[in-house]
Amino acid sequence: QMVLENLHRWNINTDYLVTLDDVNTGTAHITLAEGDNSIIVLLGANARVDESIVDGAWDAISKADLVMVQNEIPLKTIGYITKKCAAAGVKVLLNPAPAADLEVEWLTQATYITPNEHELAALYPVNNTDDIIKANAGKIIVTLGSEGVAFGKDGDIHKVPSFKVQPEIG
């Protein structure tokens, strides 16, 4: 209930939010050390996001400019979302965190993929990450923690530095 109240306080649309009485919401516990974070994820109710929930929100999803999905819901549901969005022409940003084995089809169907360096290595197990980034120019944006992001464009690797933010608790 507290999470729902906070979403309302920030004017976040909760029309398609599903609450379950027998399980807590998913949470992520973040530790920060020297500009890099480590995240412990407890899936909670997120583990129950399934095709029926996606279908129940499909009217809104199908009209979206971009749908962001990450590995904090069941992998089967990620596959369902990417396939359905690709068929409808809806762009998908796939954040493959936490790292997991994803189907190649889902990676192909995603418009953008935003792994960190470890997730990139898990998705594309080759030695040269620069080659992966270049080969997927316009698709893969690698998050580099305190170093910013890297992406491929015009046969080169481009990096955008991060900027300092003040972590907030609440």
Task: Pin down the residues of each PLM region.
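Conserved N-terminal subdomain of the carbohydrate kinase-like
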Residues: 1-66
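Short, hinge-like loop/turn segments at secondary-structure boundaries
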Residues: 6-10, 32-36, 87, 109-113, ...
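Residues that scaffold the ATP/ADP-binding catalytic core of kinase and kinase-like folds
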Residues: 40, 123, 152
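Active-site donor-binding loop signature of nucleotide-sugar glycosyltransferases
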Residues: 42-44, 115, 162-164
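A short, aliphatic-rich alpha-helical micro-motif
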Residues: 58-62, 107-108, 134
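Conserved beta-alpha-beta core of the PfkB/ribokinase-like small-molecule kinase fold
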Residues: 66-131, 147-149
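Conserved phosphate-binding/catalytic region of the ribokinase-like
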Residues: 101, 128-170
